Amino acid sequence: MIYLYTADNVIPKDGLQGAFVDKDGTYDKVYILFTVTIGSKRIVKIPYIAQMCLNDECGPSSLSSHRWSTLLKVELECDIDGRSYSQINHSKTIKQIMIRYYMYSLIVLFQVRIMYLFYEYH
């Protein structure tokens, strides 16, 4: 059984949609699907997916001893034929699609950051 530490600034308790473990032998990861609700008059729910290592033991210092050190999260954007879909309905049936989309998003984000650092320091 996996227990998730949830806090309103990381993963809101009321927005948790589901979680699953991907065991590939080398790096076992936990994927978490959740939504963040924003707004007071017009409520908007934004879907996210997060990834963290299953063996994450938190950070070494006292400030980060209760925080995940491998947590990565990204907003999900689903746009099909100009229509935007922003609700997670069935997290189990879309597991593989989410993993592929999330991994692609992380690779693109990582490449953008590398390019930014390269141009900033050269």
UniProtKB/Swiss-Prot annotation:
InterPro entries: Semap_dom, Semap_dom_sf, WD40/YVTN_repeat-like_dom_sf. Residues 1-122 form the Sema domain. PROSITE patterns: SEMA (PS51004). This is Semaphorin-like protein A43. Variola virus encodes a likely non-functional truncated version of the semaphorin-like protein. It comes from the Viruses. It comes from Variola virus (isolate Human/India/Ind3/1967) (VARV). Belongs to the semaphorin family. Signal peptide: none annotated.
